[in-house]
UniProtKB/Swiss-Prot annotation:
ATP binds at residues 86, 104-108, 511. Its main location: membrane. SUPFAM superfamilies: Helical scaffold and wing domains of SecA (SSF81886), P-loop containing nucleoside triphosphate hydrolases (SSF52540), Pre-protein crosslinking domain of SecA (SSF81767). The gene is secA. SMART domains: SecA_DEAD, SecA_PP_bind. The lineage of its organism: Bacteria, Pseudomonadati, Pseudomonadota, Gammaproteobacteria, Thiotrichales. It is a peripheral membrane protein. It catalyses: ATP + H2O + cellular proteinSide 1 = ADP + phosphate + cellular proteinSide 2. This is Protein translocase subunit SecA. Coiled coil: none annotated. It is found in: Cell inner membrane; Cytoplasm. Keywords: ATP-binding, Cell inner membrane, Cell membrane, Cytoplasm, Membrane, Metal-binding, Nucleotide-binding, Protein transport, Translocase, Translocation, Transport, Zinc.
Length: 906
């Protein structure tokens, strides 16, 4: 019934395209008129549109004319005319939606349309790319269009100083990476002077490769941190002990003789000790003098030892060199699981990175204390309007809509897509699969067809490279180790009979052009003459035609990725702009996806049915693969959703703190703010010793006097005053305390330079707030680590987390107020020069902070904050009931076994 209705009225996507096509017709009708304008008249349009906006006209009304203006500017400056489908893409982006556009459809050019239109307001537009290279490239490519129309263009990259960043953000349109924009936001909220802040309003953002940034990287918070206590000795100790533990092949074993020390769960990327393993590691720790003879690892005070043990166990059993990470310049560099890129600067959390450093024998760096953090989910929600572009978002449409409120619109291609997608071929073993890939490559290059092979790991790319070398097949390898050569390798990938091996092509950002990249070839010529350029073009045309006749670019996938979207990104490299192309995936039953998520019985049946070198290629297996990928995608979605629920608690608090901090920073005079805080502190202090509405017998006036003297340097004999006049009530005494604190401050500052006092007050407010916020993040992190234990008491951990996080936040705000007033009361107010010097010293002490994009650690661990040096000790309680065994049902009521629930090491 639904399909019948869709045939009659069309899908939602089709109806939307039909609706905006009317706007495209309007833009097209303006083209002849705009072609007649002189350059000066066309440039003057920007001023005209801004005038109309100032007079109350809205952007939607300006859209047809503004888009026609950009199209004409593109023709005159770049000899590039926006196609109708690109205009549709621009409208989609302006409306705050996600435009799914195939590879080669010109997303970079599309972004100029909504960027120009929205920059007319003067509030700035941010264009986000996945790396610095693409940010610089896209800004340089499109700057001619923007600057022709009087728009300024800036680029934010990693090596800019604060002044350069400020200038870039002041531009009408600013390009940069998601990391840089996020870190600048955090750094701005750590600044001590308004002039040190570099960003302005977050008005409108266009995110290129939006699925990669908002989904793949949603589990990886941006963190600014400082070093905490050194724990390298403990990591090195456990790294030495873990290899003595024997791996058990599966969770359950038939008898005790088969039991080993630990087993791994590859789905959740976790490792678990068995009872035998616990006993073994305890004995080793006792021999090392780490545990007392009557102590055990289950004791709450050993939670940090469990932290080191679990991290080292996972490092040895689940994370592999050249697959999950590489060692470069004596540092561990993570490999992005989605793109195969090396990610210098990123670190795993929960001690995993330190454990891998110990495993590989490089320097173990200290774990860090979080000073500021935010997830991309919450950072991009700070913008008034979000839009995105990608080649593959439809499979993630539900998540983009449910979390970000973004609707995905599939944009028609300018020319029909004619790629031929072959059935997957499945082999019994990895070696047979690789042999088949080599034979396929050999056959295809014999007819001049270029081949791009996508692998899931560096190890796989190097194995395949070795096999090709044995067959004397010329090829290029593109993976994390060859990151610097990326652009030149991609430029060559479309040459006839060229073979390129790439680790997960997702996010590469460069089109593969059949016959090679003509623009790159011309750019490489030194002072070319018109004849040189004509000759290069003629040679390129021959190669282009030859590759088309050979079938276009062929994509070969060496295995299926966990996500269908990543597979589609790889496929999307072929058949751009109506070119021919092919794609084919080769799999084996030993591939991670099938080994972990397909049923064991089915895998055994398939292996038995295949003789050496034989393969399967039929629809049933495609369903099995699709189902397995669906499981993984659903699993990851739940993790991201769970992360957001937890992070939203901190995000609400972050907004309060940052808004409060900004008000301090922008205020010329904070004396009124401090006056209000003094009233709050006086009331808080008074009720600590004189409970509201209580009888006189419960008053602790002596304690209140001591607190006033020790914390505020105030001598006030309340007991004597009350004895002399017993008619004094609670409110009278409270007023006396409030007045005493106020008078003390006035007396202290009356003979001082008001400018110095105001500056010192502001510095004290900011410094105290930053210190308390940093300590609060640490407390929240510890709370998050231990909150699942509340399941023992039949309580919902999430609700408990929200409740306790709120209590911690309220306490932190009270402590901040109390400390800042107490400090100002006790400290000698400095001169202006002394304040500036103190401020400089404080900022210098913060100079060793690190900006890190924390990496995804696994699917069962927390992801919103960096690790802390030590979890808080828990009060030991005695068990009232019988001991819960590892295979018994968990007492939390989850229905899971105890070892799979609350016995897990957090």
């Amino acid at each position: 019934m639904l399909s019948l209705v869709q045939k009659i009225i069309g899908s939602r996507n089709e109806r939307f395209i039909k609706k905006v096509s009317r706007i495209v017709q309007k833009i097209n009708s303006l083209e002849p008129e705009f072609e007649k304008l002189s350059d000066e008249q066309l440039k003057a349009k920007t001023f005209e549109y801004r005038e109309r906006l100032a007079n109350g006209e809205i952007l939607d009304n300006l859209l047809p004319e503004a888009f026609a203006t950009v199209r004409e500017a593109g023709k005159r400056t770049k000899n590039m005319r926006h196609y109708d489908v690109q205009l549709i893409g621009g409208i989609v982006l302006h409306q705050g939606k996600v435009a799914e556009m195939r590879t080669g459809e010109g997303k970079t050019l599309v972004a100029t349309l909504p960027a120009y239109l929205n920059a007319l307001t003067g509030d700035g537009v941010h264009v986000i790319t996945v790396n610095d290279y693409l940010a610089k490239r896209d800004a340089e490519l499109m700057s001619d269009i923007y600057e022709f129309l009087g728009m300024s263009v800036g680029v934010i990259v990693a090596d800019l100083n604060p002044q350069q960043r400020k200038e870039a953000y002041a531009c009408d349109i600013t390009y940069g990476t998601n990391n840089e924009f996020g870190f600048d936001y955090l750094r701005d909220n750590m600044a001590y002077e308004k002039e040190q802040q570099v960003q302005r309003s977050r008005n409108y953002v266009i995110i290129d490769e939006v699925d990669s940034i908002l989904i793949d990287e949603a589990r990886t918070p941006l963190i600014i941190s400082g070093a905490s206590d050194d724990s390298s000795e403990m990591y090195n100790l456990f790294n030495r002990l873990v290899p003595y533990l024997e791996k058990q092949e599966k969770e359950e074993v038939e008898n005790e003789q088969e039991q080993r020390d630990f087993y791994v769960d590859e789905k959740s990327k976790n490792a678990y000790l068995t009872e035998k393993g616990y006993a073994k590691i305890e004995n080793m720790l006792k021999k090392e003098g780490i545990l007392e003879e009557d102590d055990n690892l289950y004791s709450p005070h050993n939670i940090t030892k469990m932290h080191y043990l679990n991290a080292c166990l996972r490092a040895h059993s689940l994370y592999q060199l050249n697959i999950d990470y590489i060692v470069r310049d004596q540092e561990i560099v993570i490999i992005d699981e989605s793109t195969g890129r090396a990610m210098p600067g990123r670190r795993w959390s929960d001690g995993l990175h330190q454990a891998i450093e110990a495993k590989e024998g490089v320097k173990v760096n200290a774990e860090n204390q979080t000073m500021a953090s935010i997830t991309f989910q919450n950072f991009f929600k700070l913008y008034n309007k979000i839009a995105g572009m990608t080649g593959t978002a439809d499979t993630e449409a539900f998540e983009l809509h449910s979390i970000y409120g973004l609707e995905v619109i599939i944009i028609p291609t300018n020319k029909p897509m004619i790629r031929k997608d072959h059935h997957d071929e499945i082999y019994g073993s990895v070696s047979e699969k690789f042999d088949a890939i080599v034979e396929d490559i050999k056959e295809r290059i014999s007819k001049g067809q270029p081949v791009l092979v996508g692998t899931a790991s560096i190890e796989a790319s190097e194995v395949l490279s070795t096999l090709l070398k044995k067959k004397k097949i010329r090829h290029n390898v593109l993976n994390a180790k060859q990151h610097e050569k990326e652009a030149s390798i991609i430029a060559m990938a479309g040459y006839p009979d060229n073979v390129t091996i790439a680790t997960n092509m997702a996010g590469r950002g460069t089109d593969i052009i059949l016959g090679g990249n003509l623009e790159v070839e011309i750019a490489q010529l030194e002072d070319p003459t018109p004849e040189d350029i004509a000759q290069i073009k003629a040679e390129w045309l021959k190669r282009n035609e030859a590759v088309k006749k050979a079938g276009g670019l062929c994509i070969i996938g060496s295995e299926r990725h966990d996500s269908r979207r990543i597979d589609n990104q790889l496929r999307g490299r072929a058949a751009r702009q109506g070119d021919p192309g092919e794609s084919k995936f080769y799999l084996s039953m030993d591939d991670n996806l099938l080994r972990i998520f397909a049923s064991q019985s089915m895998a055994e049946r398939v292996k038995k049915g295949l003789k050496g070198g034989e393969s399967l290629a039929f629809g049933f297996m495609s369903k099995v693969i699709s189902k397995a990928q669906g499981k993984v995608e659903s699993y990851h979605f739940d993790i991201r959703k769970n992360l957001l629920e937890y992070d939203n608690v901190v995000n609400t608090q972050r907004k309060v703190i940052y808004e409060q901090r900004q008000s301090f920073l922008e205020a010329e005079d904070v004396s009124d703010i401090l006056a209000d805080i003094r009233i709050d502190v006086a009331e808080q202090l008074f009720h600590d010793y004189v409970p509201a509405g209580s009888m006189h017998e419960l008053w602790d006036l002596e304690g209140l006097e001591k607190a006033l003297k020790s914390d505020f340097m105030i001598e006030l004999d309340l007991q004597k005053l009350y004895e002399e006049d017993d008619s004094l009530g609670e409110e009278d005494l409270k007023r006396l305390v409030r007045e005493a604190i106020e008078i003390e401050f006035v007396e202290k500052t009356k003979n001082l330079d008001s400018g110095a006092v105001r500056q010192f007050e502001k510095f004290s407010l900011l410094q105290s707030l930053d210190t308390h916020w940093r300590e609060h993040l640490s407390s929240i992190d510890h709370l998050r680590n231990s909150i699942n234990l509340r399941g023992y008491a039949q309580k919902d951990p999430k609700n408990e987390y929200k409740k306790e996080a709120f209590e911690l936040f309220s306490t932190m705000l009270d402590n901040f107020k109390y400390e800042v007033i107490s400090s100002l009361a006790k400290i000698r107010i400095a001169t202006e020069e002394e304040t500036q010097r103190a401020q400089q010293e404080w900022q210098e002490s913060m100079s060793d902070i690190k900006a890190e994009h924390e990496s995804v650690i696994d699917n069962n661990q927390r992801h919103d904050e960096d690790e802390q040096e030590e979890a808080p000790k828990v009060q030991q309680v005695r068990r009232e009931g019988p001991k819960v065994k590892r295979n018994d049902p968990c007492p939390c009521g989850s229905g899971k076994k105890y070892k799979q629930c609350h016995s897990k090491v957090e």
